[in-house]
């Protein structure tokens, strides 16, 4: 059964940074849940022995996920553009979805942390998308 907008479910895509940064991500997820949004977050869902890449692929392609919140920061931008780590894997999965569906609303870029000089750290595949 597919979720409706009345009961949204989001997956949070982000680059692992410092422990403080992961706490900030977890705080956002907790706030969203407090607002009635189901949240899929690796910090809560992945367990020892799980395949992280399979988790990312399933989370991004899951039809019950109404939105993928892409939390942008300089580390995310660098990893996405270089196709490194988990962010690079997610970028390879997400970018065709964005390019093939010009009016898509599932993948939402969120400026979570700006660069040192206040710049918006958008990876190349998100450059033309409006952001939060």
Describe the residue ranges of each PLM region.
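Hydrophobic/aromatic beta-strand patches that form the interior of the parallel beta-sheet core
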Residues: 69, 106-110, 130-132
């Amino acid at each position: 059964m597919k979720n409706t907008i009345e009961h949204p479910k989001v997956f949070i895509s982000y680059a692992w940074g410092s422990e403080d940064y992961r706490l900030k991500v977890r705080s956002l997820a907790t706030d969203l849940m407090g607002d009635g949004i189901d949240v899929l977050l690796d910090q809560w869902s992945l367990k020892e022995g799980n395949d992280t890449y399979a988790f990312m692929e399933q989370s991004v392609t899951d039809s019950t996920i109404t939105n993928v919140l892409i939390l942008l920061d300089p580390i995310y931008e660098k990893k996405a553009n270089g196709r490194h780590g988990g962010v690079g894997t997610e970028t390879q999965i997400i970018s065709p979805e964005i390019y093939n569906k010009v009016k898509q609303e599932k993948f939402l870029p969120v400026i979570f942390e700006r660069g040192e000089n206040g710049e918006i750290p958008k990876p190349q595949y998100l450059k033309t998308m409006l952001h939060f």
